[in-house]
A protein has these predicted regions:
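Structural detector for short beta-strands of small beta-barrel domains
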Residues: 2-21
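Acidic/His-rich, divalent-metal-binding segments that scaffold phosphate/diphosphate chemistry
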Residues: 83-201
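Short nucleic-acid-contacting surface segments enriched for D/E, G, S/T with interspersed K/R
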Residues: 45-63
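Histidine/acidic-rich helix-loop-helix segments that form or flank divalent-metal centers
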Residues: 174-177, 187, 201-205, 212-276
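OB-fold (S1/OB) nucleic-acid-binding surfaces
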Residues: 18-44
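OB-fold/S1-family single-stranded nucleic acid-binding modules
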Residues: 67-93
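Metal-centered catalytic cores of metalloenzymes
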Residues: 64-66, 143
């Protein structure tokens, strides 16, 4: 059920086609009072009356008019009220600062070929890197989210390498942190006016996943150890890993990158509201 008195938070929104050829919106809302989720449907006529900015992840909304369908366990929404607009992500100044901090780690890399490749690649795609989200839903799903996530990974890596008795190849760890999600600059699209995120279907047809892309560019450049870390960073095959960490005799570095990535995805600035204050 739903209530017109509850202020809901937008979790995710997407638009698809019905069998009749019309548009249908799918909106998932969270009740901040108990954390429960409400799945909503909006027909094309309702979508045409609403501003896309309404559906930005993190927005606080009130359902003005709707009906609950018990059979499908969803709410057919015909009118919404924006209560509070969420921050879309990093502003331009913040993006520049994060980009500068991220790329400063490249100067800590001793391997000239690897350092040169990273600097050249990031310079070539800097505009995409500065705005790309790190996900559509799971974590850092906002403008500049990939920048924040990648910078967090580099920070966590440095702290952990300084504290560990085991001494990994720092060059490769920094590079794997910088590149493990780099394919996301092509995998996702983000509307800078509304903050809405979607998949780029052309990328998914060509590359399947961002992990495959990152693995491939590193292998092409001869950075096999970095490629292997990227292949394993999701941890399990069912989570999208090319190399499953359940396999035997894997290098410790593979586990390190996975754990660092997971730390940022769980404990970093995972949503735009955390950027405020």
């Amino acid at each position: 059920m739903f209530s017109t008195d509850i202020i809901y938070e937008v979790v995710i929104f997407s638009v698809g086609d019905t069998k009749a050829g019309t548009k249908m919106g799918k909106l998932q809302l969270k009740n901040p009072q108990d954390g429960s989720l409400l799945n909503c449907v909006l027909w094309e006529e309702a979508l045409n009356r609403m501003d896309n900015k309404l559906f930005r992840c993190g927005n606080l909304l009130r359902i003005v008019s709707g009906s609950f369908n018990e059979k499908f366990n969803n709410c057919l929404v015909s009118a919404l009220e924006l209560v509070k607009e969420a921050k879309m992500g990093l502003n331009e100044t913040e993006r520049e600062l994060y980009y500068k901090e991220l790329t400063s780690y490249f100067d800590k890399i001793q391997n000239e070929k690897l350092r040169g490749f990273l600097k050249e690649y990031f310079e070539k795609y800097k505009d995409k890197i500065k705005t790309a989200p790190a996900a559509k839903l799971m974590h850092h799903n906002y403008i500049g989210g990939l920048l924040v996530h990648t910078t967090e990974c580099l920070k966590f890596a440095e702290i952990n390498m300084d504290a560990m008795d085991y001494k990994p190849n720092r060059d490769n760890i920094y590079a794997a942190c910088a590149l493990h999600d780099i394919g996301k600059i092509f995998e996702y699209t983000i509307d800078l006016e509304t903050g809405l995120i979607d998949y780029d279907e052309s990328f998914r047809h060509e590359w399947l996943t961002h992990s495959q892309y990152g693995f491939s560019i590193c292998m092409t450049q001869g950075f096999k150890e970095v490629a292997k870390m990227i292949a394993a960073h999701h941890g399990r095959a069912e989570w999208g890993a090319i190399i499953d960490l359940n396999e035997r005799d894997l290098e410790p570095e593979l586990y390190l990158i996975h754990l660092i990535d997971n730390m940022s995805a769980k404990f970093g600035k995972i949503n735009a509201s955390m950027l405020e204050g």
